[in-house]
Amino acid sequence: MSKMAEEKVLAAPATVDGGMQSSGDLQASSAAAARVRPVETLLRAAPLGLCVAAMAIMLRNSVTNEYGTVSYSDLGGFKYLVYANGLCAAYSLASAFYIAVPRPATLSRSWVVFLLDQVFTYLILAAGAASAELLYLAYNGDKEVTWSEACGVFGGFCRQARTSVAITFASVACYILLSLISSYRLFSAYDPPQPSLGNKGVEIAAFPR
């Protein structure tokens, strides 16, 4: 190998097998993560208050009148909403503390945060969607199965449930943003796919006239 070729090899940036970035790129990513850490910590703490508020409103949602008594515990979708908000509140607190403490950026930690963000995002989204469907039936009924609307009789119950569901969807928005942040942090640690080294052109057969 010539001297010039050796210099080119030494000057080329080292990459990790599997398409990961070099150590210098990882250090740059760590510096960028340190700059956005306070913002991400606040964003992770925000769902804590939202989830607790949605859970507390739904837990107190019970109405009694001359037509009877209705409580959130009578409906499986609303019970799921309470459980999901409780779990997401605990995760928000834990993840906010985890992000607030400076740690070396590693690929395994990025994968863990990414996967947990995905799990809890879909968990709270499913709870909000199921509860929204219950609210729709409570307000409009379902003529095909002869279900009458119930909010005309239990209006206070429906209003509290609607408030809890609206707050839950605000938490969903926060978790979607967190999922985008964690996915960007994870996949930016990998190099983009390299173009194929095969033939770039397409040969077209020429037929004689």
From Swiss-Prot:
TM ranges: 39-59, 81-101, 110-130, 164-184
Residue intervals on the Cytoplasmic side: 1-38, 102-109, 185-209
Subunit structure: Homodimer and heterodimers.
NCBIfam families per record: A_tha_TIGR01569
Sections of the chain in a coiled coil: none
Lineage of the organism: Eukaryota, Viridiplantae, Streptophyta, Embryophyta, Tracheophyta
Membrane topology annotation: Multi-pass membrane protein
Official protein name in the record: CASP-like protein 2A1
Keywords: Cell membrane, Membrane, Transmembrane, Transmembrane helix
Family: Belongs to the Casparian strip membrane proteins (CASP) family.
Subcellular localization, as worded in the UniProt entry: Cell membrane
GO (cellular component) term, any one: plasma membrane
Extracellular side, ranges: 60-80, 131-163
Listed InterPro entries: CASP/CASPL, CASP_dom
